[in-house]
């Protein structure tokens, strides 16, 4: 239900933002064409980056660590939300544990979850990427992700991910 609420709000943001340049502000990307814009958003971050990706891959993790090293040194906080190493259901838990440890050593804050992990990124509490792409795992061409500028949606994702999960989430897209 919470995911439907976020998708509804993002859909509202997409349709209400038609006056702006859709390709720059609000857009839907496929698994084959989001990376360049996503990486630019990451490199434009000034305060913080939160990436929630249930699945992770060594290639994407080490690419992210390398790409964001200077950002981190400049004070940008990076948080990764992902499954516990033994919750992946495939592969070697020791390998996932090592990836988590390498991200920690690189200065990333790691929040692990056991049951549900959404797929999104929030940059500077305003730029939101939300969809079914695992941002830290292998891309699938048929997956998609939406990019919107919305402090409200960013706030809701933060509340769902880090806040009181028992609190009812408002789903009124006309706020």
Regions found by a protein language model. Name each.
Residues 119-122, 146:
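Short beta-strand scaffold segments in enzyme catalytic cores
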Residues 38-105:
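Primarily the HKD phosphodiesterase
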Residues 134, 141-175:
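Amphipathic alpha-helical interface segments
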Residues 30-35, 58-61, 110:
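A conditional alpha-helix N-cap/helix-loop micro-motif detector
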Residues 13-32, 52-55:
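Acidic/glycine-enriched edge-of-secondary-structure segments
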Residues 1-6:
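Short, small-residue-biased leader/transition segments that mark boundaries at the very start
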Residues 79, 108-113:
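General small-molecule cofactor/ligand-binding pocket signal
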